[in-house]
Amino acid sequence: MYRVLLVDDEYMITEGLKVLIPFEKWNMQVVATANDAETALAYIKDNPVDLVITDVNMPGMNGLQMIEQMKNSLPN
């Protein structure tokens, strides 16, 4: 099963995505949610994921900056 991390500063968005997207149909499982980029970056250091779905506009570090840091800090 593919491991999915959802990142959004609005709780209702991450909860809504879990309901609206048929993750199980595509052999995916939401393993964690994060409400900011820093929390997501800390999570992936010890917990590998296959897919990150993120909001672009978040306070502090935005989603694009977060993805760039993930790419630079992870081997694959």
Locate the predicted segments by residue:
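Active-site beta3 strand of CheY-like receiver
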Residues: 4, 47-53
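Conserved SAM-binding loop
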Residues: 6, 33
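Two-component/phosphorelay signaling modules centered on CheY-like receiver
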Residues: 11-32
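Receiver (REC) domain active-site loop signature in two-component systems and cognate sites
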Residues: 58
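Acidic catalytic/metal-coordinating carboxylates
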Residues: 36-39, 62-65
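Conserved phosphotransfer cores of two-component systems
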Residues: 45-47, 69-76
